[in-house]
Structure formats: structure tokens, C-alpha cells
Amino acid sequence: MSRESSRLEDYLRRIHSLSRKNPVHAADLARDLGVSRATVCVFIKQLQEEDYVSVGEHHIITLTPKGAQIAENTCQRLDTVRRLLESLGVPGEIAARDALEIERGLSPQSYEAFHRFNDRNREKAWDLR
């Protein structure tokens, strides 16, 4: 995955996550991503131009259907990788952090294999610790 594609998915995923609790503003996103508000504003403008987000009244950032689809797919992929790592005995916090790194380089074929593995082994209680 390219660096720009990874950045796109990070922003969309964070907007998706933050919007579950409250309306999302550039300052919220900057704080969550650990970047400046100016950096967020520049990238949000690009996301608007590509129809991934819209910025409405009171500067509230929302995902468009196109952006929401990418965010949801990214969240599903992360969840699949995290669940696989946890089934192998990796503690939850570490599994979540590692899933972010692994998911970025995962081919569609490997993702599908992880997903099938999780589905087949859902009922099994793996604990390899």
C-alpha cells in the first residue's frame, strides 16, 4: 500500500471512529492524529475534492458514502488481523497496535485467508500463551 493510500485510510478511519461519539472538527482530528490543525485542514481539503468527506455548517467533517465505505473496509480488515493475533495469544493492546502495521501491507489474498481462518476457528478457544 502506498504511503498516501495509508494516510487516506488513517484519516478516514479516524473520522469514522471519532464521529461515533461527537461531531468531528479539524482540531479533534489533529489531536487524535498527533499533527497540526493546518496539516489536517490541507488534507481535508484534498479529501473534499476527491469526495471522501464533506465539511458542513460549523466546520463539521463528515464522511461521504465513498469515504465511509473505505473507512468501514479498513476497520473490518484491522479487526480481522487483530482477532487473528489475539487468537494466537497476543494481548489485546499489542494486537491492536500490530494490526495497524500488518494491515497496511496485507494482500487481498492474505486478508481473505486470515478472514477464513478466523471464521473456521471462531468457536475454538485458542490460548497459546
Please identify what each model-predicted range represents.
Residues 31, 48-49:
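Alpha-helical residues within the helix-turn-helix
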Residues 38, 93:
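Key DNA-contact positions within bacterial/archaeal DNA-binding proteins
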Residues 2-35:
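N-terminal helix-turn-helix DNA-binding core of bacterial DNA-binding proteins
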Residues 97-129:
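C-terminal regulatory/oligomerization modules of transcriptional regulators
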Residues 59-77:
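Basic, amphipathic "hinge/linker" alpha-helix immediately C-terminal to the N-terminal HTH DNA-binding motif
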